[in-house]
Amino acid sequence: EQAENEKNVKIKQRLLTFVVVGAGFAGVETAGEINDFLHEAISYYHNIKRDDVQVTLIEAGTTILPGFNKNLSKYAHTRLEKNGIKILVQNVVTSFDGKNIDIKKLSDSSSESIIDSHTLIWTAGVTPVEIIQNSAFKLKNGKIIVNEFLEIPNYPGIFAIGDCSQLDSETNNKFPPTAQLAEAHAKLTAYNIKQIIENKEKKKFEYRWKGQSAVIGKRYGIAEAMGMKITGFWAWLLWRNYYLTKMPNIEKRIRVWLDWNIDLFSRIDISRYGFKRDT
């Protein structure tokens, strides 16, 4: 709404430029969803053209979605650019003052540029919460080191799971920050707590990778599952069906399924405040 009524070209440009930092799962899916939403919503705003809106994705690494097969990452890169998203790899954000985003190219430290934008979305990584940093537990890279039972060494019966934990450094094994892993951690920890209560033998954590998928725009995705590499509509459909199975009960699955089907055949739903302007 603000950009629709803005007369200053530079301010309007800032309002319609959206920058997402970090091209992992969260960054790519966020950029894709924002881009789709904006370009569909434009039809409601007569003073905004399609070319006025720009979504930029910034990644410090050499490729987006580095955890995927290279061909799948390349497909995602091409699809996002085809949808109008600008992708800058090997670039980092050095500062943001609410109006200007300063970025620097890693391959050339003298190469700096500025993106005019009011909106910066950060998905490039997280730091541990203060309670972990100030704890008495042994840390590595800001994460609590755990043993093969997900217990904290020297603190029997105390577990650390999910993004805040890392296997003992001697195993040279890190945990990927995914919901799939967090769910596996939670199930094993619940089981081991039960075993401790009953004075029975605990079970070691063994991570069984089930595959992965990412949405890269409306009705497009990439996926790796059962040794197969899938792209496009079928990968997107696989992603949706998998997440339906994660709904806690049949009622919620039906609600989500109906909502997704309505979304397939209807225009985007937006809410307008309808502010009155002073005349």
Each language-model region and where it sits:
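FAD-site-proximal beta/loop scaffold in flavoenzymes
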Residues: 1-7, 100, 113-184, 191
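A short alpha-helix-loop-beta-strand transition element characteristic
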Residues: 2-13, 48, 199-207
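N-terminal Rossmann-fold NAD(P) dinucleotide-binding loop
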Residues: 27-28
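A conserved short coil-to-beta-strand element within the FAD-binding core of flavoproteins
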Residues: 89-100
